[in-house]
């Protein structure tokens, strides 16, 4: 079932059409967020449950699974879901819209959203993050990597690895930090950075579900 909103439908179709190109381009976990990944892993107990939210071709799903974590991966793209089911057969992989997570409360120790949350409009981000908070256990970890812009805005731009245009939300760092805190998270790390050879400024946020709800 395709997304009803035309912009989100365009995002879904863009990744379906470019899934093989994207998967070939990004075969391994992004090295430019390895620092964040190591911090995320260091705080997770052995055997933790992780939701890879917007898993793409599954490079992080595979890494977490290899490390012994119990991984559930979701994506809006049918093609990515097919690819990841083959790539990581011991992970649970579902087609799902991250704006409407169909999981019980407190199901996961960690939620990983690497360059996926950027496809959610600012007007819907608070509700989406509240959904993330709901499926995390108390103290559960949250990570997101996003596009950083000169202002917070919804734009159409070219996706690396596919050379296809679709919609992304660019963020001012202070704006997204405020929204993350407003959704019940404590931020432990927030950094602007740029990928070598990349075309966009980026940012990452690492935090955990606060007990001050």
Language-model regions, residue ranges each:
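A short SAM/SAH-binding and catalytic strip from SAM-dependent methyltransferases
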Residues: 110-124
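A short glycine-rich, Lys/Arg-flanked "PGG" loop and its adjoining helix->strand segment in the class I
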Residues: 126-138
């Amino acid at each position: 079932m395709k997304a009803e909103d035309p912009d989100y439908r365009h995002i879904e179709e863009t990744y379906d059409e470019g899934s093989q190109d994207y998967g070939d381009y990004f075969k391994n976990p992004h090295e430019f967020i390895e620092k964040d990944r190591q911090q995320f892993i260091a705080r997770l107990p052995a055997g933790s449950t992780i939701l890879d939210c917007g898993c793409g071709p599954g490079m992080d799903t595979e890494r977490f699974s290899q490390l012994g974590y119990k991984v559930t991966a979701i994506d809006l793209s049918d093609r990515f879901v097919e690819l990841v089911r083959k790539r990581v057969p011991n992970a649970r992989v579902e087609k799902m819209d991250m704006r409407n997570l169909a999981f019980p409360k407190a199901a996961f120790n960690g939620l990983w959203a690497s360059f996926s949350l950027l496809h959610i409009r600012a007007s819907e981000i608070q509700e989406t993050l509240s959904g993330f908070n709901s499926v995390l256990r108390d103290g559960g970890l949250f990570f997101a990597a996003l596009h950083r812009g000169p202002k917070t805005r919804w734009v159409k731009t070219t996706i690396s690895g596919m050379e296809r245009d679709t919609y992304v939300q660019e963020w001012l760092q202070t704006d997204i930090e405020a929204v993350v805190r407003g959704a019940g998270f404590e931020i432990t790390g927030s950094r602007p950075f740029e990928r070598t050879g990349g075309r966009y400024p980026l940012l990452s946020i690492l935090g955990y579900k606060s007990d001050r709800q």
